[in-house]
Amino acid sequence: MFAVIKANGKQYRVAAADEITIDHLDAEVGSVFTFPVLMLGGATVAIGAPHVDGATVTGEVVEQTRGDKVIAFKKRRRQNSRRKRGFRADLTVVRITEISGLGETVKAEPKSKRAPAPEAAADA
């Protein structure tokens, strides 16, 4: 099952356990958000007008970060005129934990802890 959600004026196609990078949300790491659902897909499809009634997508904020630097450079030739400006967008990484609607619910499996690294043989 997948869903199309709206976050900060943009649309994202998500499934359970996906991690998406969206524009900055004012939220602390670990907080939970519910996003409006524009469309649900799977065995049956539901398209909202504008939202699908009773459908929810829940996500947990994983990280607050910044994007790559974008350089804006303007030059007017033969005028000795140039301008250089950099920009880095504030971004939020969100992990989709649950999609529910159309009578079914899909939950993301909790991230399993990484198995400990095999230790070197102590007898060697």
Swiss-Prot record:
- Entry annotated with the keyword rRNA-binding: yes
Oligomeric and partner information: Part of the 50S ribosomal subunit. Contacts protein L20.
Question: rRNA-binding: present as a keyword of the record?
Answer: yes
- The signal peptide, as residue positions, is none
Q: Give the family, as the similarity comment puts it.
A: Belongs to the bacterial ribosomal protein bL21 family.
| InterPro entries (alphabetical) | bL21-like, bL21-like_sf, Ribosomal_bL21
The domain of life is Bacteria
Q: Which gene encodes it?
A: rplU
Mind listing the GO biological process terms from this record? translation
Any one GO molecular function term: structural constituent of ribosome
A Pfam family that the UniProt record links to this protein? Ribosomal_L21p
Sum up the protein's function in the record's words.
This protein binds to 23S rRNA in the presence of protein L20.
Protein species of origin? Xanthobacter autotrophicus (strain ATCC BAA-1158 / Py2)
Question: Which cellular components does GO assign to this protein?
Answer: cytoplasm; ribonucleoprotein complex; ribosome
| Name recorded for this polypeptide | Large ribosomal subunit protein bL21
Q: Which UniProt keywords apply?
A: Ribonucleoprotein, Ribosomal protein, RNA-binding, rRNA-binding
